[in-house]
């Protein structure tokens, strides 16, 4: 077999985790797919020798890196992270790369002089892209060599390799040189420079191997400078005997600094030095930082390219070191290079490295502190010696010290006041007091001896106790022997006869032993029971019987725990960690002392008496888990002591079964395991392999076309980011995602839709399943009518004659239906799996779960596919509920044949059933939560136990859970609605949860009813139904039955609460409502079959002739349409029902006539009549009037006789006519108290309320049918109360607005006229804001201050002694304080402006004169916080001056503008405008990104106009992007960002945007073309040739002449290109341009020199800042903020990072004072990023 070849690319892919870790350490991110693409496709095209399989050759990697880092359009910024990571792997190879990396070649050539023999070459592979399989170099890292100075002739370091060096011997003990070399003698003359360069190898080297003795530039004897290049030995020694720049930049910077100061290197030497000591990336960073340090003429860093290139060139300059100018350039260059080294050496902050510095076991605190400070200097920008950082260093010193020292330092008193020196001294004391190793060994030895001594003493004591016990037992034995001898002597010899080996000692019979003797009273001893879940004995151990202690084994959290029954323990105890603990704790007192322990959280425990919630005490040091009295009480346990030991049983004597488990796993307790009676054997699985999910795989409905999901017309794609997901959850759902990908159900995609994935943990396991949150998608998809069958009545189609059943559950049913490719993008979600190379979106190709229409779509598809099966098998009943199938047959054979046909059909159609859940050909099956057996449906025991086991609810949510679970079983509970009536009010939101006796009784009744739930027959649609109905206290109860022989078999128990209106009717009418409600519910089960209603009332006559005084027309019509349908509903004879069963009693009940009962029903007052009383004391007429007058509704009520008004009153505005009628009638009844009264009213509402409806309202609690409070509740209650005041009463209804001369007509007209007049004439007694009616103060309350008196004196007011107040203009004067309180209160009510409030006060009469009203009102309105935050403000800021360039191409403004329609993908226009000339450049783009901006800037603007100095833009994402700003920094461009939400700041380019778009619009209208890109040159031509503010066009400013309108090419143009006249023309153009440019620049500068102060805001002022995007009911202004810095047009405020234009702020107090004499001073601080502002007088 062949062996796979390992390549660098495959090696990195095999160790991809390490590659990602390396990239992460470099602060970059790499992707596997792009890694392969760049290595195999991109980098081989660079023509530097990069193979397609990759290489670790550093030279080739460097060449590729140079290509990638190339500036301009030829660079590849997207490949930077990948080549940097590849280089890091090659430079610092991990273990799996080292065998494949070339060792560095030795810095030597073949020796030119005798020297040591060269080392044998390493067997390394040749430099190639393909490496041999396994070739590993030596693992030992050679120590750096210190080479002597070269003695040979000088060589060219740039073209030749360095000379050979002999291998130095081991260093001398003092480290000053090699062992075989002698230092030079003292007094020797210094050699000349030439001698030092040409000395032989026999001369000893210098002591410092890192310092060269030949300086590159030195002064010779003739005054000329001589150049001496660096020797290769110096470069080698510097590189190998110093750390790299990345490891310790400070040390290498110090070395280079000394070399620069002492050697005076040239430009070439500096490049050689940097290239030797630094890597390529480090060198680039140093050069970049050095160029940033170049300063301009003003002493500040400059960004001008020419100044930077002059001071720090990147190419070799022509600096002559023999001239002073050249030497000055070199000195300046070295200074800049040193600054670049220092700036580049500032490594990024890495506090993790600092935290990793910990004190060693034997390290002193002082040494540890030095290491800590060094880490701060190396890995952070902070100086540990800075007093401001002393606190951080001190805390790190405490936390990272040795554990014993750190704990003691933390406990020091007044730790905050301790300095770092104090902490070090304390740490030194603790360190010095540590015990020495000898002392520690002595202490351990002493403790060991003491422990051994105690153990020996305990052994001796134990031995003595054992001997004492043995003597005591021996004494008892001897006493027994002596007693037996005495009895033998007294009674003779009584020896027991000898027994055979199989003889019983009790009955003396052979064949059994005594313990199995059947003649013993307790019978033979049975086999010992084995305890599985519960055991009363321990399992014992190693052949020994466990102690007879009562024990019970409980299963806690899935693990069995054996408890010791301890009646002395008050609480039950767990010893192992049970999971989360609560915050509660308890003090436990034991034999050895007391200690505090914590409680566990509540655990739900299922006991023999039901499920309870219990909390255990967690005591880890308890020797055994204890079952205390608290849980024994809940168990109702009984402990019996017998001869074999103690036994613990329940209250009924049964063994206890105790189990602790999670609530979500509770249902599994009650489900019976699948019995082995009908297993799915190999026959069913082998005969139909395509029908089972276990053998057929994932299903696919072959007859169903792919589904297209229609969207709503206004729907737009929704994209929601993936929620954060834990690592455990991601790993949990990863296998499911992988499985679905392998099956093709999930596929990668790119979609504008995205919804998050939610991992849901499966209960009781550590497995997760992926669930997609499709709620937002569901909102945007068209709704379809759900056709899924109702499980409530689905079984109505199953006749009782079919009693053989098969139940099938389809596996992954929704995944059987395909999605159309156009709809697959709707269900995309994010998923990243680096190991599989997946990073993007996945979507479903099948119908997903969680989609709202999935059940309906699948249900309809499966119905269509199974239609043929139903036609071919008419004798079988097939019920389908989504993916649950029930097949019913009359015989076992038919059921088996039908099941086979169904399985064959499902397999052919592509559906798969679950073999684990299948129930095939059984007479008893579970379907939809019901137990089907013998034509009846039962509640399953599991469902009963679930309801019975729930603890007493303590919250509304728990109660809703209980009612929901029990409500599913309501068909089996007679009168469920009445039972649960006390519970439902507690489930309402906002209701106080109070669990009382009534609720507990209802709770227990529902549970008890479930235990006795009967079997319900399946509805037989071939037989009629009978509905027995009863009603009690507003609750309808009934039972739906069918005849089964002579008996009535219940089909369902129905119950429901009547609405509040029907609940207030008489009993006979309530029965009508009850029958109507239950008939509607029964119709869901009868499916339109005939229904006979049996009730104890003759309701048929009531329905046919309903009393109109009780029922509304709408309700009457509804009842008649429902109950008088004779084809479906019939009424049976009147029967008396048993209240328990709701079935008829054998004896007949008392008969009554419902019509007679209703006729006798009366209202509130029995003697109330509607006929006039002949002997009445008074006859009155009442009326209420409500009408609109001048836009206001006025109302009044009156009580009159025929000729005079008895009582009349105006009612509050807005009162309705019905309410006014009730008030008038109630007032008449009150005035006639104790008298006989006839009262007439023309209001049907008031008449019906008094006679009929009032009592009905009172009975039903004054609620409407919806349960809401009725209108005019207070007036109705007052009327019902006033009905009993007169002695005798008659309320008579008369028509309103009658004509004629009858008494009723005259009285009614009189009452109506009086009500209208009083409503018009009088003002209702309501609270108003008029001062004269509700003045808060009187004259006596006024208190005038001294300031008030002065102001009053100036006004000329006089003091009135009688009124005791000041008077002005005939009105009492209100003091200033009272005026402020009144006006402030008025402003808080209205928040009107100053002018409108003043106008309001002047228009309304005021009895007082308000002192200083206008001034006070102005202060109140201007200082109101709410008004300041909401009211708009006029901008008083003057227009600023725009900064322009001083020549063309130096200052540009840039902006994006959107142009619609976007043809060919071009939707945006990138506009450049030169602020000096107005020249415009515009480029159509497809995207609005920073990449587009930088590309156009470098490819279009820079080559044609030169590098700009200033760029001005708004704060768009493309301009504030890091890419744009980085490019600007590299190019030295000053990028100015304008104020946010201030388009005037970019006014020139914004105006040009408008001009271009207007021109394009006109051109498209004129030409008829929609291609604006084609018309753009014409628009630019117009913009460039339009005169500006100075009368010149941008073309004329730039080119010095107008553009040629017509230009025909001349064929002889080439002949005159070198004509002298052409040169003269160019010179003239130059002169014209300067003549034009200079005045323009002067005009622009004149605008800037004008002293303008646009805004009055100063540092320290308080301002409000405008919100540019306000939400609903959000203030328009935010703040106030304090001004920190100002410019002529913008402000910097505290709390907002960006600058704010002055037009976007307003003063918090508009009364801005003029500038004072104080001035602000700016001072520098130690931090270069901070300034200090001080204020003082000038």
Swiss-Prot record:
Region (Interaction with host PIAS4): 345-393
SMART domains: ZnF_C2HC
Residues annotated as domain Peptidase A2: 561-631
ZnF (HHCC-type) intervals: 1387-1427
EC number: 3.4.23.-, 2.7.7.49, 2.7.7.7, 3.1.26.4
Domain RNase H type-1 span(s) in chain numbering: 1174-1320
Residue positions of covalent lipid attachment, annotated as N-myristoyl glycine: 2
Catalytic activity: DNA(n) + a 2'-deoxyribonucleoside 5'-triphosphate = DNA(n+1) + diphosphate; Endonucleolytic cleavage to 5'-phosphomonoester
Sites marked Cleavage: 131-132, 215-216, 478-479, 534-535, 659-660, 1330-1331
Modification Phosphoserine occurs at: 192
Recorded superkingdom: Viruses
Ranges of biased composition (kind: Pro residues): 110-124, 161-173
Cofactor: Mg(2+)
Annotated coiled-coil segments of the chain: 438-478
Residues that hold Mg(2+) 1 according to the record: 809, 883-884
PROSITE patterns: ASP_PROT_RETROV, ASP_PROTEASE, INTEGRASE, RNASE_H_1, RT_POL, ZF_CCHC
Entry's Gene Ontology BP terms: DNA integration; DNA recombination; establishment of integrated proviral latency; proteolysis; symbiont entry into host cell; symbiont-mediated suppression of host gene expression; viral genome integration into host DNA; virion assembly
Disordered: annotated segments: 110-218, 434-499, 513-553
Cited PANTHER family: GAG_P30 DOMAIN-CONTAINING PROTEIN
Family membership: Belongs to the retroviral Pol polyprotein family.
Name this protein carries in UniProt: Gag-Pol polyprotein
């Amino acid at each position: 077999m062949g062996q796979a070849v390992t390549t660098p690319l495959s090696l990195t892919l095999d160790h991809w985790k390490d590659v990602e870790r390396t990239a992460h350490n470099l602060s970059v991110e790499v992707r596997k797919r792009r890694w392969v693409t760049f290595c195999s496709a991109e980098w081989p095209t660079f023509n530097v020798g990069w193979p397609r399989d990759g290489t670790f050759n550093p030279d080739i990697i460097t060449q590729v890196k140079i290509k990638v880092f190339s500036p301009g359009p030829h660079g590849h910024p997207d490949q930077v992270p990948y080549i940097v990571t590849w280089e890091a792997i090659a430079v610092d190879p991990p273990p799996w790369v080292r065998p494949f990396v070339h060792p560095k070649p030795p810095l030597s050539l073949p020796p030119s002089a005798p020297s040591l023999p060269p080392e044998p070459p390493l067997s390394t592979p040749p430099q190639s892209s393909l490496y041999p399989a396994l070739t590993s170099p030596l693992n030992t890292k050679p120590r750096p060599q210190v080479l002597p100075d070269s003695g040979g002739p000088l060589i060219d370091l740039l073209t030749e390799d360095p000379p050979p060096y002999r291998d130095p011997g081991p260093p001398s003990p003092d480290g000053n040189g090699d062992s075989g070399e002698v230092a030079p003698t003292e007094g020797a003359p210094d050699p000349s420079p030439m001698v030092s360069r040409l000395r032989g190898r026999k001369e000893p080297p210098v002591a410092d191997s890192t310092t060269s003795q030949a300086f590159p530039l030195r002064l010779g004897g003739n005054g000329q400078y001589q150049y001496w290049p660096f020797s290769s030995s110096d470069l080698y020694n510097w590189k190998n005997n110093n750390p790299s720049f990345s490891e310790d930049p400070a040390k290498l910077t110090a070395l280079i600094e000394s070399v620069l100061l002492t050697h005076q290197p040239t430009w070439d030497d500096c490049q050689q030095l940097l290239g030797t000591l630094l890597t390529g990336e480090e060198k680039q960073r140093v050069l970049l930082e050095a160029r940033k340090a170049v300063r301009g003429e003003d002493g500040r860093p400059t960004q001008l390219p020419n100044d930077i290139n002059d001071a720090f060139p990147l190419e070799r300059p022509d600096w002559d070191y023999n001239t002073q100018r050249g030497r000055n350039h070199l000195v300046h260059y070295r200074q800049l290079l040193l600054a670049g080294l220092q700036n580049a050496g500032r490594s990024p902050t890495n506090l993790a490295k600092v935290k990793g510095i910990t004190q060693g076991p034997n390290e002193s605190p002082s040494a540890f502190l030095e290491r800590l400070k060094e880490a701060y200097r190396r890995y952070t920008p902070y100086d540990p010696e800075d007093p401001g950082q002393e606190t951080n260093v001190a805390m790190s010193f405490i936390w990272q010290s040795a554990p014993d020292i750190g704990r003691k330092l933390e406990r020091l008193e007044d730790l905050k006041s301790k300095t770092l020196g104090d902490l070090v001294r304390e740490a030194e004391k603790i360190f010095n007091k540590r015990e020495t190793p000898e002392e520690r060994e002595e202490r351990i030895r002493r403790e060991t001896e003491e422990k051994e001594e105690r153990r020996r003493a305990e052994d001796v004591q134990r031995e003595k106790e054992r001997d004492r016990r043995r003597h005591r037992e021996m004494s008892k034995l001897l006493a027994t022997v002596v007693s037996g001898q005495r009895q033998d002597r007294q009674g003779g010899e009584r020896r027991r006869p000898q027994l055979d080996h199989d003889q019983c000692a009790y009955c003396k019979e052979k064949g059994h032993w005594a313990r199995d003797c059947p003649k013993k009273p307790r019978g033979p001893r049975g086999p010992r029971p084995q305890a599985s879940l519960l055991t009363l004995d321990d399992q014992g151990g190693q052949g020994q019987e466990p102690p007879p202690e009562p024990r019970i084994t409980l299963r806690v959290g899935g693990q069995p725990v054996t408890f010791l029954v301890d009646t002395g323990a008050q609480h039950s105890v767990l010893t192992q960690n049970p999971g989360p603990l609560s915050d509660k704790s308890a003090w436990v007192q034991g034999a050895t002392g007391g200690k505090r322990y914590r409680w566990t959280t509540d655990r739900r425990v299922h006991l023999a008496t039901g499920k309870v919630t219990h909390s255990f005490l967690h005591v880890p040091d308890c020797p055994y888990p204890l079952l205390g009295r608290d849980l024994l009480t809940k168990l109702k346990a009984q402990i019996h002591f017998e001869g074999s030991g103690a036994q613990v049983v329940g209250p009924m004597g049964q063994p206890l079964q105790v189990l602790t488990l999670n609530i979500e796993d509770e249902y599994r307790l009650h489900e019976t395991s699948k019995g082995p009676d009908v297993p799915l054997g190999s026959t069913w699985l082998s005969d139909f392999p395509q029908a089972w999910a276990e053998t057929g795989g994932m299903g696919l409905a072959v007859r169903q076309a792919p589904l297209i999901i229609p969207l709503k017309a206004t729907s737009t794609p929704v994209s929601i980011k993936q929620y954060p997901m834990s690592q455990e959850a991601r790993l949990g759902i990863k296998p499911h995602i992988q499985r679905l990908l392998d099956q093709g159900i999930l596929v990668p995609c790119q979609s504008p839709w995205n919804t998050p994935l939610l991992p849901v943990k499966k209960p009781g396991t550590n497995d997760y399943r992926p669930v997609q949150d499709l709620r937002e998608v569901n909102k945007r998809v068209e709704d379809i009518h759900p056709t899924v069958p109702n499980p409530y009545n689905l079984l109505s189609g199953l006749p009782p004659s079919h009693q053989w059943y098969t139940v099938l559950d389809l596996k992954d049913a929704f995944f059987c239906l395909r999605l159309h490719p156009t709809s697959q993008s709707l269900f995309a979600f994010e998923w990243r799996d680096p190991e599989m190379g997946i990073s993007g979106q996945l979507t479903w190709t099948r119908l997903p779960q969680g989609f709202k229409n999935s059940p309906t779509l699948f249900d309809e598809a499966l119905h269509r596919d199974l239609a043929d099966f139903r036609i071919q098998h008419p004798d079988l009943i097939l019920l389908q509920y989504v993916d649950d199938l029930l097949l019913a047959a009359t015989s076992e054979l038919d059921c088996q044949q039908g099941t086979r046909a169904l399985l064959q059909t499902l397999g052919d159609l592509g559906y798969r059933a679950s073999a684990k859940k299948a129930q095939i050909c059984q007479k008893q099956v579970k379907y939809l939560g019901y137990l089907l057996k013998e034509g009846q449906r039962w509640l399953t025991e599991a469902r009963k136990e679930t309801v019975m086991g729930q603890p007493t609810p303590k919250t509304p949510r728990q109660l809703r859970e209980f009612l929901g679970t029990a409500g599913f079983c309501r068909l089996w509970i007679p009168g469920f609605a009445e039972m649960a009536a006390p519970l439902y009010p507690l489930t309402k939101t906002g209701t106080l949860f109070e669990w009382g006796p009534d609720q507990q009784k209802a709770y227990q009744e529902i549970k008890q009813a479930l235990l006795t739930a009967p079997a319900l027959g399946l509805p037989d649609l071939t037989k009629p139904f009978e509905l027995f109905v009863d009603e009690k206290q507003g609750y309808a109860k009934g039972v739906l039955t069918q005849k089964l022989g002579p008996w009535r078999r219940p089909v369902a128990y129905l119950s429901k609460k009547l609405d509040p209106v029907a609940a207030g009717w008489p009993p006979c009418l309530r029965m009508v409502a009850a029958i109507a409600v239950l008939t509607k519910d029964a119709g869901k089960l009868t499916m339109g079959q005939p229904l006979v209603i049996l009730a104890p009332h003759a309701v048929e006559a009531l329905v046919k002739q309903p009393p109109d005084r009780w029922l509304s027309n709408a309700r009457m019509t509804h009842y008649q349409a429902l109950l008088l349908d004779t084809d479906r509903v019939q009424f049976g004879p009147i029967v008396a029902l048993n209240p328990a069963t709701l079935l008829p009693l054998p004896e007949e009940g008392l008969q009554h006539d419902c019509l007679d009962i209703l006729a006798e029903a009366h209202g509130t007052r029995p003697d109330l009549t509607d006929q006039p009383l002949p002997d009445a004391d008074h006859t009155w007429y009442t009326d209420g009037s409500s009408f609109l007058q001048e836009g206001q509704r006025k109302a009044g009520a009156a009580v009159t006789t025929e000729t005079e008004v008895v009582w009349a009153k105006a009612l509050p505005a807005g009162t309705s006519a019905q309410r006014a009628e009730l008030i008038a009638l109630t007032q008449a009844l009150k005035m006639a108290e104790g008298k006989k009264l006839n009262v007439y009213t023309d209001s049907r509402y008031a008449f019906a309320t008094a006679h009929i409806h009032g009592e009905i309202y009172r009975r039903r609690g004054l609620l409407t049918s919806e349960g809401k409070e009725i209108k005019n509740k207070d007036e109705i209650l007052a009327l019902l109360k006033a009905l009993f005041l007169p002695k005798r009463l008659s309320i008579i209804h008369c028509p309103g607005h009658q004509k004629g001369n009858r008494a009723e007509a005259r009285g009614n007209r009189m009452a109506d006229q009086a009500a209208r007049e009083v409503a018009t004439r009088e003002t209702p007694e309501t609270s108003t804001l008029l001062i004269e009616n509700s003045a808060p103060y009187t004259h006596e309350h006024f208190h005038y201050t001294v300031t008030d008196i002065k102001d009053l004196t100036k006004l000329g007011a006089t003091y009135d002694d009688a009124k005791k107040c000041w008077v002005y203009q005939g009105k009492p004067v209100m003091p200033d304080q009272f005026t402020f309180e009144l006006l402030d209160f008025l402003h808080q009510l209205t928040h009107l402006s100053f002018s409108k409030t003043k106008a309001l006060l002047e228009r309304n009469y005021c009895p007082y004169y308000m002192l200083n009203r206008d001034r006070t009102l102005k202060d109140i309105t201007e200082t109101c916080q709410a008004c300041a935050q909401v009211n708009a403000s006029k901008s008083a800021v003057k227009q600023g001056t725009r900064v322009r360039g001083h020549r063309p191409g130096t200052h540009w403004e840039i902006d994006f503008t959107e142009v619609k329609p976007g043809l060919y993908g071009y939707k945006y226009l990138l506009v450049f405008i030169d602020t000096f000339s107005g020249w415009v450049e515009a480029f159509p783009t497809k995207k609005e990104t920073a990449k587009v901006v930088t590309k156009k800037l470098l490819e279009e603007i820079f080559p044609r106009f030169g590098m700009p100095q200033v760029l001005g833009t708004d704060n768009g994402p493309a301009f504030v992007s890091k890419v744009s700003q980085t490019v600007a920094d590299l190019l030295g461009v000053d990028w100015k960002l304008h104020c946010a939400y201030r388009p005037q700041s970019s006014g020139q380019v914004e105006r040009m945007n408008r001009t271009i778009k207007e021109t394009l619009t006109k051109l498209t209208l004129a030409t008829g073309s929609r291609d604006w890109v084609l018309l753009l040159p014409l628009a630019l031509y117009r913009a460039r040739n339009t005169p500006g503010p100075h009368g010149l066009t941008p073309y004329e400013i730039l080119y010095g002449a107008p553009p040629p309108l017509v230009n025909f090419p001349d064929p002889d143009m080439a002949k005159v290109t070198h004509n002298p006249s052409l040169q003269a023309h160019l010179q003239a153009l130059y002169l014209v341009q300067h003549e034009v440019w200079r005045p323009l620049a002067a005009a622009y500068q004149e605008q800037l020199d004008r002293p303008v102060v646009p805004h009055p805001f100063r540092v320290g002022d308080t301002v409000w800042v405008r919100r540019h995007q306000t939400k609903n009911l959000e203030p328009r202004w935010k703040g106030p903020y304090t001004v920190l810095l100002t410019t002529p047009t913008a402000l910097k405020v505290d709390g907002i990072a960006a600058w704010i234009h002055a037009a976007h702020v307003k003063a918090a107090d508009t009364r801005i004072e003029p500038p004072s004499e104080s001035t602000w001073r700016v001072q520098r601080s130690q931090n270069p990023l901070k300034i200090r502002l001080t204020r003082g007088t000038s």
